[in-house]
């Protein structure tokens, strides 16, 4: 009985130690959510406005530019997937990887080969374990990405986009990231980054009528200058939104782990109390039995 009681107490101490860690990680993740959401809100206006500028330029010119023009017979697509560098974030990375798998299957069904560019150690480890070649690996900044991080990814993508097919160029760029909906809901989404998807509609553009521009030196020159800015800003917005989603997923996972630890502590405490009561009952029985034996002997 005494050995069983010691074992329960050892387990309680072990779970209490784990609970302190998960609780601390929960609080850290919760504090990062607000900061990440503020960064998303700050970056969104620039990304949306540069998209409006490109739409305005495309609407006022008839030139065929790689930024806005579909390539006939597109045969190769780059796919960027954003995952986490660390674990303990629930299904955050696995959901993004699953969505990437669906996108790759769709592209393959259209007869397109895919080049993978993976952000986050979870993603690189996943594909390396499966022997999948990656054209780009970017790690170390999933929780707090900077614009320089987005630019490093964008530079590789733009170089592939403007390269010829003989030199390993791609015809399309897709990005898979996790969209922050709320503290409870984060949804993995796949969007085509290049060429831009321009839809013709009779409805007025969001944000008001598109501005009228005069182009110097030319509309094509403006689009050439906007190409890297557009890719960088869109990737930066995706990285920031994914960072907010990662923190929310980790906060929720750590809260669940903390709650489970509390339930486990309560269960072990009840079992320890029961073992202690059994030990006391046994001791009393032995004392009473000994007393009765002495009494009967006299």
Swiss-Prot record:
It is found in: Cell membrane. HAMAP family: ATP_synth_gamma_bact (MF_00815). The keyword 4Fe-4S does not apply. This is ATP synthase gamma chain. GO terms for cellular component: plasma membrane; proton-transporting ATP synthase complex. Produces ATP from ADP in the presence of a proton gradient across the membrane. The gamma chain is believed to be important in regulating ATPase activity and the flow of protons through the CF(0) complex. GO terms for molecular function: ATP binding; proton-transporting ATP synthase activity, rotational mechanism. The keyword Ion transport applies. F-type ATPases have 2 components, CF(1) - the catalytic core - and CF(0) - the membrane proton channel. CF(1) has five subunits: alpha(3), beta(3), gamma(1), delta(1), epsilon(1). CF(0) has three main subunits: a, b and c. Keywords: ATP synthesis, Cell membrane, CF(1), Hydrogen ion transport, Ion transport, Membrane, Transport. Belongs to the ATPase gamma chain family. PANTHER family: ATP SYNTHASE GAMMA CHAIN, ATP SYNTHASE SUBUNIT GAMMA, MITOCHONDRIAL. Its main location: membrane. The gene is atpG.
């Amino acid at each position: 009985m005494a050995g069983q009681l010691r074992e329960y107490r050892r387990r309680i101490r072990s779970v209490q130690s784990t609970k302190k860690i998960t609780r601390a990680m929960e609080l850290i993740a919760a504090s990062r959510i607000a900061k990440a959401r503020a960064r998303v809100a700050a970056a969104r206006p620039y990304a949306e406005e540069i998209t409006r500028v490109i739409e305005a330029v495309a609407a006022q010119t008839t030139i065929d530019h790689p930024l806005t023009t579909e390539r006939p017979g597109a045969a190769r697509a780059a796919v960027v997937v954003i995952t986490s560098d660390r674990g303990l974030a629930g299904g955050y990375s696995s959901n993004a990887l699953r969505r990437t798998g669906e996108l790759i299957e769709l592209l393959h069904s259209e007869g397109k080969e895919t080049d993978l560019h993976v952000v986050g150690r979870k993603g690189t480890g996943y594909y390396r374990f499966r022997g999948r070649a990656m054209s780009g690996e970017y790690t170390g900044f999933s929780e707090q990405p900077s614009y320089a991080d987005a630019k490093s990814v964008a530079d590789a993508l733009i170089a592939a986009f403007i390269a010829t097919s003989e030199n390993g160029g791609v015809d399309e760029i897709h990005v898979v990231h996790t969209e922050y909906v709320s503290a409870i809901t984060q949804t993995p989404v796949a969007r085509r980054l290049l060429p831009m998807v321009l839809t013709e509609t009779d409805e007025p553009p969001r944000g008001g009528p598109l501005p009228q521009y005069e182009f110097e030196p030319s509309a094509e020159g403006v689009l050439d200058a906007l190409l890297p800015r557009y890719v960088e800003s869109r990737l930066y917005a995706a990285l920031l939104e994914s960072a907010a989603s990662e923190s929310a997923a980790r906060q929720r996972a750590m809260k669940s782990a903390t709650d489970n630890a509390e339930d486990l502590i309560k269960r072990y405490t009840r079992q320890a109390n029961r073992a202690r009561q059994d030990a006391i009952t046994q001791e009393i029985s032995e004392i009473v039995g000994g007393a009765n034996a002495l009494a009967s002997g006299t």
